[in-house]
Amino acid sequence: MLAQEVQQVLAAGTDDASACQISNMTAYEMEKGRKIVGLTKGATESFVVPRLSPLNSTGGEQWAFDGVSEDGVKSFMFGFYRDPNYSILGAGNFRLSLEFGFANRERVAELYYAERTVIETCPQGVRGVWYSESEGWHHSFLIKADMSEAVITLNSDSLKGTITYKSKSLPIAADGHVWPNGNATTEPVRYLHWSEPIPAGTVEFDVEIKGKKATWKGIGGHERFWTAFSWFTCLTNLQGLRAMAGPYVLSFFRFESGLDEGHVHQSAVLFKDGVQIFRSTLGAESDTEDYVLAQKTYGGAVTGDLKDKVTGFQVELVSPSKKQHYTFFIEHKNLAFEYLLGEGVGGSGFSAIAKGGHVGQLQYEGPSLTEALTFPKNSPLFKSNYV
């Protein structure tokens, strides 16, 4: 019954239900054998619609959401997966990871494996539902068609509530171009596609977590990943951050290829009052081209258990032609999530505070979230599935 109900939610709001497209899949449903499946590229189609159809044994996709409180100490990080590569960690292809960080440095992490996922694309937006009828839970996201707003709804025995987003930026592709753009790329490294439907915006968090109510305001963002092969195959590491300070929204991401040794793609974007004012993929100084210099910082108070004891970031955005120079310092305030993958490396995220602006002008302060992932060189769990 639930499957029919979730399919009707968006369709009921349009005059023409046939205008909606339904992607309805069960936990083990995918093509058998080495069959080529559809994987859409580029930045003309909506970033939030399904990009793999159907699933096969090598590819996958993720809808990722995060948020951090105004004081930089509370956080959440969610991953809605359609990805058979994660079946090694649980039952089926539909992993759902929900992680919460609290001001007292406690963390709560919950994992769900859905029996079915339904993604409904209608003229007014996209709704995705991950659910289990046998276990009696369902978690969902609803994203407006122009990707300016989103709502996450949580409904299980231990999690109940909503998280709402209102973007203060514009959707961007992997090279920082604003959607839609026929010349933009979503492929920072070979076979891995990435975009930010919401680089950053305001967040209102209202969730009951294991019987305790938590409400706060802050910022957050939404990312999309879709890959032809596993993350371990496509990547050796990634770094990323988002921040919102005064009128500014900053997004920075760096990807290092796992297939093409030495290939690194990074992208930095800056918005002011909702308008993109800076974009660059150049990571070295130049007298003529816009460039970004980003580096980890150390010596701060908050770090994790991984080998890399990073405590923040410094990001320099420079436009020689416009004679503009923006600097942002990000200092970690709390550990949002962390998982060890062996060899002292793994994935981690931090809630933080950013300070910065244009050099010589008024400086602003606001919440930020950083994340990093490094795969071990040798692991029985992570093997290349490139074919």
UniProtKB/Swiss-Prot annotation:
Induction behaviour: Expressed exclusively during fungal penetration of host leaves, the time point at which plant defense reactions are triggered.
E.C. numbers: 5.5.1.-
UniProtKB keywords: Isomerase
Gene Ontology MF term list: isomerase activity
InterPro entries associated with the record: DA_C (IPR054499)
Keyword Isomerase tagged: yes
Pathway this chain belongs to: Secondary metabolite biosynthesis
Entry similarity comment: Belongs to the Diels-Alderase family.
Its job: Diels-Alderase; part of the gene cluster that mediates the biosynthesis of a tyrosine-derived cytochalasan acting as a fungal signal recognized by resistant rice plants and leads to avirulence in Pi33 resistant rice cultivars. The first step in the pathway is catalyzed by the hybrid PKS-NRPS ACE1, assisted by the enoyl reductase RAP1, that are responsible for fusion of the tyrosine precursor and the polyketide backbone.
Protein name stated in the entry: Diels-Alderase ORF3
Species: Pyricularia oryzae (strain 70-15 / ATCC MYA-4617 / FGSC 8958) (Rice blast fungus)
